[in-house]
Amino acid sequence: MATVYVNDGLSPTAATPQNRVESYDLGGKVRFATMKYTAPATGMPQIGDVLVWVPALPKGARVIPHLTKLYFATGTASSTLTVGDGASAARYLAATAITTAGSAVCEAAAASGGAYITGPASGDQMITSTVAGAGIKASQVITLHLAYVHD
């Protein structure tokens, strides 16, 4: 009988580094970054504006989609927000309505059986959100809980 590894051919005992299990697959330390944004009373972000979530992820970090979540208070009708990075503005969360209080799991990268863990950040990776549909409501609170592995 054949032995088939179900992680893209990676083996926990492989002799070459390219085929060894990575920390995000087994035994890695999950880290969390919680970032909160409160829109100002005037001069709120408008359609096309980009929110940059600070701090940046360290080089080589990988976001864990199903543990990363965006929370938001009630906002402007038609307002949407994405969560992405330099690779794609909606890498983690496609445009999502932030019109009523709620939350969204940032797992766009894992949709349709895609990559469970996204590729590593090539540099200090800035996580961004792009505003669409309508501007963000004055005093609206938006919080990003970002889970990542960096080992």
Regions flagged by a language model, labelled:
Residues 2-151:
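Surface-exposed, low-hydrophobicity beta-strand/loop segments enriched in small/polar/acidic residues
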